[in-house]
Amino acid sequence: MTNNHPATLTEKLIVALDVPNALDGLKLAETLGDAVSFYKIGLGMLTGGGLALAAELKDEHGKKIFLDMKLFDIGATVEAAVRGLTQFDIDFLTVHGDPHVVNAAKQGAAGSNTKILGVTILTSLDRQDLDKCLIKDGDIQDLVLERAGLAFEAGADGVIASPQEAPMIRALPQAKDRLIVTPGVRPAGAALGDQKRVATPAQAVANGVDHIVVGRPVWQAADPRAAAMAILDEMA
């Protein structure tokens, strides 16, 4: 099955390599072939050779890499960590969207091609979850919008948010030329898993999202390549 979709569409799909180790991740990437050009490596994979996998996918296979670390620490530590990670030529890197964290990350990424994405509120959380964590009262969409605005003002190249909040974020003046990247995307009919604020690939694109992140619906599929191609078809 040949991928006849344009590269501009293929790059909108980021597949999360949430598999046990780098070898499994590489095998999956080889199975997906030209159907996927962008991969997310999260904290779980980092302990299983994730940075080595990132380097191999970049250098040997020409793929783009989204390193999902959600860094959160004092400014000096974040800046140093980001500066060290830029040696891997990462395309996207996540930090928590707090202004001091974003600002430090941007300083650490200076002179590199790494784009810093600020996390607003995890797509696996709803208002009840926020209440348990003693997060301030208010509609969750309003909180996401507030955090997105603060992240943009601190210099973030983009934000992580659910596709449900994407239209409001896109309408922010600060969002001009910034990226909106959304987990919480599930193909029509797919199980939600641990996601709560979700949309289909087609809905996400219609809502102004730049990139969608999909994991289990691809790598748990009997035919991962066909699953990825079906998602691209939904997005087209």
Where does each model-flagged region fall?
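C-terminal helical cap(s) of enzyme catalytic domains, especially alpha/beta-barrels
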Residues: N103-G108, V205, V218-A236
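Conserved anion-binding
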Residues: A7-L13, D73, T77-P167, L172-L179, ...
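Conserved, mostly hydrophobic/aromatic
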Residues: V15, Y39, K70, L93, ...
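Catalytic cores of alpha/beta
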Residues: L28, A76-L85, I169, A190-D210, ...
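Structural motif
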Residues: D34, E60, F88, A154, ...
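N-terminal glycine-rich anion-binding loop in soluble enzyme alpha/beta folds
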Residues: T2-T31, A35
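Metabolite-binding pocket within alpha/beta catalytic cores that recognizes anionic/polar moieties
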Residues: F38-F92, P99
